Amino acid sequence: MMLELLPITSPYAVGVRVSGKVNQDDMETVAKAMEAKLKKEDQLGMYIELDHFEGFTLRGFLREARFVFRFMNHITRTAMVGDSRWFNRAAAVIARFFPNVEIEHFTPLQRDEALIWVAEKDAEVY
């Protein structure tokens, strides 16, 4: 698995660590985590740690498209933690599919700040 769910205690955010190429099973794992938190909250933040993002497999990309349509109105913020070169690549993908989502980059040293920012309940919804 190239995507690992992270234990985010906030009810307002889902966290993942991405390393390598994301596949269909990875996207299904994230979708299930999102659905579980959306039972109690209507809007969520996404916390993403990028280790070595290489994109998606074809099936992963198709699953990503379904993920986008299912959750596009529920994600308000995305905090991306990692090297800036991975941020630019991943942010372009997210911005293309989630145009109304606030996206911020944080360095690994700013991990705690990223967790606080992404889990703020009063994130502005467009």
Language model segments and positions:
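Amphipathic, Lys/Arg-enriched alpha-helical "gate/interface" segment within cytosolic domains
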Residues: 2-126
